[in-house]
UniProtKB/Swiss-Prot annotation:
This is Small ribosomal subunit protein bS6. Keywords: Ribonucleoprotein, Ribosomal protein, RNA-binding, rRNA-binding, Selenocysteine. InterPro entries: Ribosomal_bS6 (IPR000529), Ribosomal_bS6_sf (IPR035980), Ribosomal_S6_plastid/chlpt (IPR020814), Transl_elong_EF1B/ribsomal_bS6 (IPR014717). The keyword Ribonucleoprotein applies. GO terms for biological process: translation. Pfam families: Ribosomal_S6 (PF01250). It comes from Desulfotalea psychrophila (strain LSv54 / DSM 12343). Binds together with bS18 to 16S ribosomal RNA. GO terms for cellular component: cytoplasm; ribonucleoprotein complex; ribosome. SUPFAM superfamilies: Ribosomal protein S6.
Length: 159
């Protein structure tokens, strides 16, 4: 088995159901040929294409990292060429030979990286909330000081 990654771009005008069908069919090609999907990520939104393709300036990106056979890659690319929903695709071979232990390690590494990213995002959000609270507190203090100054009577001195 070898490790590959494929990114493919789907038409932005497709329904969510059709997008999911294309993704499921693509993943099924890999799994049916005794492959393993290490990581896949649909973009979830249309993004601008750097180059216009088939008169479309946007697309729905899907990234897939997997271990499979060359036959599975050939079949997947054959279907991409036939499928009108796929605007572009590209497959890159990452490793010629990968063992089951290396696959599990890659899956674990990706899970750890995702957990670290999630933790960092939560920490950043907490820090942002803390900053907002401090700013609100300072604004409230200044408003209170201004109110006290306005409420205090001004003594006029006679000369």
């Amino acid at each position: 088995m070898r490790r590959d990654e494929t990114i493919y771009i789907l038409r932005p005008t497709m329904s969510e159901e059709h997008i999911n069908t294309v993704i499921e069919n693509t993943n099924k090609i890999i799994l049916d040929d005794a492959g393993t999907i290490i990581f896949y990520e649909p973009s979830g939104a249309u993004k601008s294409l750097l180059t216009u393709s088939r008169k479309s300036s946007q697309g729905y990106y899907v990234y897939c990292d997997y271990a499979g056979t060359p036959a599975a890659v050939s079949e997947m690319e054959r279907r991409f060429r036939i499928e009108d929903a796929v605007l572009k695709y590209m497959t890159v071979k990452l490793s010629e030979d990968i063992s089951a232990e290396e696959i599990q390690q890659a899956i674990g590494d990706i899970a750890a990286r995702e957990a670290a990213v999630k933790e960092a995002a939560e920490a950043e959000e907490a820090a942002n909330e803390e900053v907002v609270e401090k700013v609100v507190e300072k604004v409230a203090e200044k408003a209170a000081e201004k109110t006290v100054e306005e409420a205090a009577p001004v003594k006029e001195t006679e000369e």
